[in-house]
């Protein structure tokens, strides 16, 4: 959708430039606005784009300065806040660089900009050097320090209170999680439902979502429904439509196959494991049943919601592929047929 809108604005040409440049200041529109400007001539709005790029880089450095010195230890809440600040720094830095790239030789910068999406620091450093050499050196250079992994000293003793007033809803929620009463974070609490931020903390431990930035876990946590099952209760029947996948919050789940009138447990999954995702992805009936082996709590995500997540989050698709590869490799690991 974003690309289609950008293409449409690109065909309008110069008359669209003013409104697109103005929309850069809106956080929810800046990404799409940059995509449109990459197809347009700036026609006299270069100074505005330069100011926006400098502001984005300054915001990135501020978030990095707040997040980098945090030493989480074993506190999952501190890990969440630190990773969220660094993810915001990363996002703002890339936005600033995309804006800076509009001020120079765009064709020379295109490959470098693509390299900014990778996580390898060496590739990013090379991309920054290319962008710096082509133009906007004063904007780009401060980011070299950030992506070199330097850790600044913290000078503000009230940094956490400051973050609790941050304009970003997500950062405020992460800060409030630390300022408020400490909650059980092992996911074994006996509440009827997990609070939203506790769901996010749990999802960070699930390898299916390990590559997602923390803010991207919030919509997943919001659509997931919590269910509890008693010992021996069926979670899903073999042959049923794969209309939902489940993430085990606590307890064990037996994977059961029925054949020739006999039931056989082929695997047991536990907390943090994802079950039922293969039927959801393939749109085929479930190849095995899911039975609670003792008290079990799960977070369930419906097929439509999961497909939407895969479309919007390519990193999640990669996680799914890894899970499927592991599932396919298990018979070989057990000495069975490949």
Regions found by a protein language model. Give the residues of each.
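Regulatory nucleotide-sensing modules
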Residues: 197-261, 265, 275
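Amphipathic alpha-helical scaffolding segments comprising HEAT/armadillo-like alpha-solenoid repeats
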Residues: 12-25, 43-59, 75-80, 105-116, ...
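C-terminal accessory/binding modules appended to enzymatic or scaffolding proteins
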Residues: 85-109, 126, 153-181, 199-204, ...
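Structural detector for internal amphipathic alpha-helices that build alpha-solenoid repeat scaffolds
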Residues: 1-12, 19-23, 31-43, 65-72, ...
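A small-molecule sensor/coupling module
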Residues: 198-199, 216-219, 280, 285-287, ...
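Short beta-strand His + acidic residue motifs that chelate non-heme Fe in jelly-roll/DSBH
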Residues: 255-256, 277-278, 288-292, 308
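Long, acidic (Asp/Glu-rich), low-complexity accessory segments flanking structured domains
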Residues: 271-272
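Short inter-helical turns and helix N-cap capping residues of alpha-solenoid HEAT/ARM repeat scaffolds
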Residues: 1, 25-29, 89, 119-121, ...
